[in-house]
Design a protein with these regions (language model features):
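Non-catalytic interaction-recognition regions
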Residues: 2-189, 196-679
Length: 679
C-alpha cells in the first residue's frame, strides 16, 4: 500500500511541477503579446492560439491531479437521469448498455472536449464482471490536441466522476488504464427475478422498424433441395430475432413462378393431360413433369416453338393458360408448405408474377430518367462506380425482362408500398456482387432513399463429408424432403439406442424424434459462421457432446426436470418469489457465474442484430449450458439421503435453474428449435 501511495505522490508532484511551468509559459506569452507591435497580426494570432491551447492543457492537468489524489475516495454524486436504470416491464435491462451510458456520463464530465471517442465497456471474467477500455483512446485524442495525459490518469479521472448507481458495486483502475467493474449481485438478482415473474423480455430498442426479410425462394415445379436449406433456416431465425426485439417483420418468399419454363410445362401438360381444364390432372410429381418437358424442349424444335407460344399466351393472360399455370403453382405450393410445416417456417409468397406490371411501369421511367444505356441491343444500368464492374441488364435484346428487372421492381415495391425501413436478402454469397450493384442502382435512381437500410445476408455452400458440394451418391442434388426424412430416421435410432422408448410414451417419443432431427439440422447450420461453407454430417450433428443441438436439448430437459423432482411447479416457484418466501440464490461463485451469463442475454442479442451473425447466439446458448453444468456439479439443488429420499430442497437454486430454462427456451425459439420437456 505504501508503494502505491508513493507512486501517486510522485505522479502528483510531477504534474504540479508541470502546472507551474505552464503558468510561467502562459505569463511569458502574455508579455510577448503585450510588447508586440499592433501591426504584427499573424504573430499575435499565433500567440493567442498557443495561449488557448496551453490554458486547455493546464485545465486538463489540474483535473488529472485532482482525480489522482481522490481516486480512492468515494465517488461523487452525479445526475444520471438519462441512464436506463428504471425498470421497464416491457424490456430486460442490459447491464452493458447501462454501464456504457454511466461511463459515457463520466467521460463527458471529465473530458467535455473529447466527444468522438467510443465508450467501450466489455464483459470480463478475469478482472471483474466488466471492463472499461476507452482510456487509451481518450489519451490519444487528448494528445492530438496537444495535451499529454497518461491513460491511467484518464481512467482515474473517469472513475472519480462515475455516477453512484446501484448497479456498480466497485470500479477500480488497473494496469495501464483499464477500469475493472464489479456489479452488484443484488441488482443482478432483481433482473433475474423479473425474468421469473414476467418472462423473458427483449432488450430496449431505440426505434421499432418495419423490416422485410426475403428468404427461401424456391422455384415452382421444382423440388426444394439442400441449396434452399440455409436461406430458409437463416431467414426464419433472423425474422424471429427481429420480431422478438419488437420490429414489424414481413417474411417474403420470392418464388420463381414466371418465365420460359412455364411455357414448356404448359405445352407438356396439354399433351399429357388434354382434359386438364375439366379434370384435375395427377401431377403430384412435378419434378418428373419438369424433367420430361425440359427434355422435349431441348430435343424437339416444334415443341420448343409451342413452348414459346405458350409463354406469350400466358403473359397475355389468356384464361386457359392462366388456369394451367395456377394448377402447376398450386401443386408446388402444397409441397413447399409440407417442408415449411416440418421446419416451423412462416412465409408470405410474393412470386415473380407479382411484379410483372410493376416492371412494365418501371422500365419507361428509368429510360426517361436517363438511367439506362443501350448496349448491343440490351438496356443496361450501371451502379455508382461509373461504368466499372457488371451492370444490371434491365431489358434483353428481345425486349424481355430479366431477374435484374424484377429485383429492381421488387425493391421499389418494398420501399414504396411495404414502407420498409430495413430490407434483408438471405441468399448464397455468390450473389453478393449482384446485390451490391442492385443497391447502387436503386440509390442512383432514387428508388432506395436515404434512411432505408438494405443488407445482403450471404452464406457459404453446404458440403458433404468429402468436402465437396453436397450431393447424393449418384451425383444428384439432395432433396430437402429426403434429408428431413433421413434426419428423423437417424434421431429415432439415437433415441432407441438410449432406450428412451422405455420411459417415453409414443407421442413423447415422436416429439423427441422430430425435435432432435429438425433441431440438429438447423443448429448445425446456424452454429457455423454463415459466411463460411460447412460440412453436413449427421454423425457429428447427432453427437450428444460438444456444441450440438442434441447436447443442448438434453441439457434443457435435465434443467426442466429439477423442479419436477423437487415437486415444485412454476406457479409455486413464482408465488414463493413474489410473496417474499424465497429469493434467487447468487451467493456461491458458481451461482454468480451462471447468473452473470444469463444477465448477458440482452447484450448478446444487441450484438447479433448488428451483423446478423446467428452463430454468436449459438455460442451463447452453449455457454449457458456448460456454465449450468459447472453450477449443478458444485451446488446441490436437491439433497437426498442414501436411500434416495429428499432431505432438503434449495429453492433459491431451483429458481436459478428456472431462469436458466426460460432463457434457453427463448434462445431455442429464436433459432427455430423446439425443445421438449422430456427426452
Amino acid at each position: 500500500m505504501a508503494d502505491i501511495v508513493e507512486e501517486y505522490t510522485r505522479k502528483a508532484d510531477a504534474a504540479e511541477l508541470e502546472i507551474i511551468n505552464l503558468m510561467i509559459e502562459v505569463e511569458n506569452l502574455k508579455n510577448k503579446v503585450h510588447n508586440s507591435s499592433s501591426g504584427d497580426g499573424d504573430v499575435l494570432k499565433a500567440l493567442k492560439s498557443k495561449n488557448d491551447r496551453l490554458k486547455y492543457r493546464l485545465e486538463i492537468l489540474k483535473r488529472a491531479v485532482d482525480s489522482e489524489e481522490n481516486c480512492s475516495s468515494k465517488r461523487k454524486q452525479v445526475d444520471v437521469s438519462d441512464c436506463p436504470l428504471e425498470k421497464d416491464s416491457r424490456n430486460m435491462q442490459s447491464i452493458q448498455e447501462i454501464l456504457t451510458e454511466v461511463f459515457g456520463v463520466a467521460v463527458s464530465q471529465s473530458y467535455p472536449d473529447v466527444n468522438d471517442v467510443p465508450v467501450l465497456v466489455l464483459p470480463s471474467t478475469k478482472f471483474g464482471d466488466y471492463q472499461f477500455n476507452s482510456a487509451m483512446l481518450i489519451s490519444q485524442a487528448l494528445a492530438a490536441k496537444g495535451v499529454k495525459v497518461p491513460p491511467r490518469l484518464v481512467a482515474s479521472s473517469v472513475v472519480e466522476k462515475l455516477p453512484q448507481v446501484p448497479l456498480i458495486e466497485k470500479a477500480e483502475v488497473a494496469g495501464a488504464g483499464f477500469v475493472n467493474v464489479r456489479i452488484s449481485r443484488q441488482y443482478g438478482r432483481s433482473i433475474l427475478e423479473d425474468v421469473l415473474l414476467r418472462g423473458v423480455q427483449p432488450p430496449r430498442v431505440h426505434q421499432r422498424l418495419r423490416v422485410v426479410v426475403d428468404f427461401s425462394s424456391p422455384n415452382i415445379a421444382k423440388e426444394m433441395h439442400v441449396g434452399h436449406l440455409r436461406s430458409t433456416i437463416i431467414g426464419e431465425s433472423i425474422s424471429r430475432l427481429l420480431e422478438f426485439l419488437g420490429h414489424d417483420v414481413v417474411r417474403i418468399n420470392h418464388v420463381g413462378d414466371w418465365g420460359t419454363q412455364f411455357g414448356m410445362l404448359i405445352a407438356h401438360l396439354q399433351d399429357k393431360f388434354p382434359d386438364y381444364l375439366h379434370v384435375s390432372p395427377p401431377i403430384a410429381d412435378l419434378q418428373a413433369l419438369y424433367k420430361e418437358s425440359k427434355q422435349r424442349f431441348d430435343e424437339d424444335e416444334k415443341f420448343k416453338k409451342r413452348a414459346y407460344s405458350c409463354v406469350v399466351k400466358l403473359q397475355n393472360h389468356e384464361s386457359d393458360y392462366i388456369k394451367a399455370w395456377q394448377l402447376i403453382c398450386d401443386v408446388s405450393r402444397k409441397e413447399f408448405q409440407k417442408v415449411y410445416d416440418r421446419l416451423g417456417i412462416r412465409l408470405v409468397e410474393r412470386g415473380e408474377s407479382f411484379y410483372q406490371e410493376r416492371m412494365e411501369a418501371l422500365v419507361p421511367r428509368l429510360k426517361a430518367g436517363g438511367f439506362l444505356e443501350e448496349d448491343d441491343g440490351r438496356w443496361v444500368m450501371w451502379g455508382e462506380d461509373g461504368g466499372r464492374g457488371v451492370p444490371l441488364t434491365v431489358v434483353k435484346s428481345d425486349g424481355g425482362f430479366t431477374y435484374d428487372t424484377s429485383d429492381m421492381a421488387c425493391l421499389e415495391q418494398r420501399v414504396s408500398e411495404e414502407h420498409a425501413d430495413w430490407i434483408i436478402y438471405v441468399t448464397d454469397a455468390g450473389q453478393a456482387n449482384h446485390f451490391t450493384t442492385l443497391f447502387q442502382c436503386a440509390r442512383r435512381c432514387g428508388i432506395l432513399r436515404d434512411g432505408v437500410r438494405v443488407d445482403h445476408v450471404g452464406f457459404g455452400v453446404v458440403l458433404g463429408e468429402d468436402k465437396k458440394k453436397f450431393k447424393t451418391r449418384s451425383g444428384e442434388t439432395v432433396r430437402l424432403v429426403a434429408l428431413l426424412d433421413e434426419g428423423v430416421r437417424r434421431s429415432k435410432e439415437k433415441l432407441l439406442e438410449k432406450e428412451r422408448d422405455k420411459v417415453l410414451s409414443e407421442d413423447e417419443l415422436r416429439s423427441a424424434m422430430e425435435s432432435v432431427a429438425y433441431g440438429c439440422i438447423k443448429y448445425a447450420d446456424l452454429s457455423h459462421n454463415r459466411n463460411h461453407d460447412y460440412v453436413f454430417s449427421f454423425n457429428k450433428m447427432l453427437q450428444d457432446k460438444g456444441n450440438t443441438a442434441v447436447y443442448l436439448l438434453y441439457a434443457y430437459t435435465r434443467i426442466c426436470s429439477i423442479a419436477r423432482m423437487a415437486g415444485l411447479s412454476g406457479t409455486q416457484l413464482r408465488s414463493a418469489l413474489s410473496e417474499g418466501r424465497s429469493q434467487l440464490s447468487l451467493e456461491h461463485e458458481k451461482e454468480w457465474k451462471l447468473g452473470r451469463c444469463l444477465l448477458r442475454f440482452p447484450e448478446v442479442l444487441s450484438r447479433v442484430v448488428k451483423d446478423l451473425g446467428l452463430h454468436q447466439l449459438c455460442d451463447y446458448l452453449y455457454e449457458i449450458a456448460t456454465t449450468f453444468t459447472e453450477f449443478y456439479d458444485s451446488c446441490y439443488c436437491i439433497e437426498k439421503d442414501s436411500s434416495g429420499e429428499i432431505q432438503k430442497v434449495n429453492t433459491g437454486r431451483i429458481l436459478l435453474c428456472e431462469v436458466t430454462a426460460l432463457v434457453m427456451a427463448k434462445v431455442f425459439d429464436i433459432l427455430g428449435l423446439k425443445p421438449v420437456p422430456k427426452m
